[in-house]
């Protein structure tokens, strides 16, 4: 079985947009939806359900008409980035070498290097090593 996860996006001219404008409906933020997906994805994967898409496909129509909600062109990347950040945060702050596949460096760093800055603020001193010896979407973490 496969699954696509699409967080709710409020589009202009829809009933949902009216409910949003009337403050009857409050959509999730991108952050809230990404955090929820970090809980949902493992649950589905453990049940043998493959996630084939996270977030709506980027289109000019959605960009023009999105009023509110969890729309981001790189939503899937944001979720994968959260997985990497959460894996590091399970460890106590300190000095670490983090080995990552070249195709996953952007996920490790996060949007606009948010993960790196957050880790620094929390007391993590990390050295990133890019290597093909680590699988895509995975990390190898070594305490220094």
Regions found by a protein language model. Give the residues of each.
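Radical SAM enzyme core and accessory elements
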Residues: 60-144
């Amino acid at each position: 079985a496969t699954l696509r996860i699409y967080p709710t996006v409020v589009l202009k001219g829809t009933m949902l947009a009216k409910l949003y404008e009337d403050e009857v409906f409050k959509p999730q933020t991108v952050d809230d939806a990404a955090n929820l997906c970090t809980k949902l994805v493992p649950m589905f994967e453990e049940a043998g359900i493959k996630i084939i898409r996270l977030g709506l496909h980027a289109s000019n129509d959605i960009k023009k008409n999105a009023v509110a909600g969890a729309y981001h062109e790189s939503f899937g990347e944001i979720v994968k980035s959260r997985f990497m950040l959460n894996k590091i945060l399970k460890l106590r702050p300190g000095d670490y070498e983090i080995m990552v596949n070249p195709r996953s460096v952007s996920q490790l760093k996060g949007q606009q290097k948010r993960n790196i800055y957050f880790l620094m603020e929390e007391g993590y001193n990390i050295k990133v090593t890019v290597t093909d010896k680590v699988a895509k979407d995975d990390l190898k973490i070594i305490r220094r």
